[in-house]
Amino acid sequence: MAGKKLDEQMEKVIRNNYRRLTGCLIDRKMTITTMESITCGQIASLITDTEGASAILKGAFVTYSNEAKIMQGVPEAVIETYGVYSKETARAMAEACKRAYRADIGIGITGTTGNIDPNNQDSVPGEVYYAVAVSDTIIDGYFQMGEQDSRLYYKLYAAEKVAETLGDVLGVKMEAVLA
């Protein structure tokens, strides 16, 4: 598997990157929402670590199961056709949460940490798909995570990859963590 192993210093940089992003969203009065599976709400949590985030975070969905994704607007046919761990599902998650909260930005992220998902036999450990929906555009990404020391570090690693993409979209200079 590819990817760096996170440590405490990297965690601080990731948290600081989210403060930058959240500050930018507050300044621009842009709203954001998330539909998170692998990160289980970590991205929304990082956003709300900045004072004033209630002005921009419209809400967030933690959709750990396939059923939860479907209940929140991901078409069942997308999951059945492409699998829950796919760019198509991540894109549908980003669109569904953006639409549900009428937000400017929607983030969808799905994947596995270091184990096979017993409910989805097609899962590959460390495989992550994500999407950022802004206006009528969706930017999606894929990466493989190497083994991390804790569940928190898996979530932070995945959250940082999303932050890098969101930073590019917003034109926010991010401090490099995973490069």
PLM segments and residue spans:
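Short alpha-helical segments enriched in small residues
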Residues: A2-A179
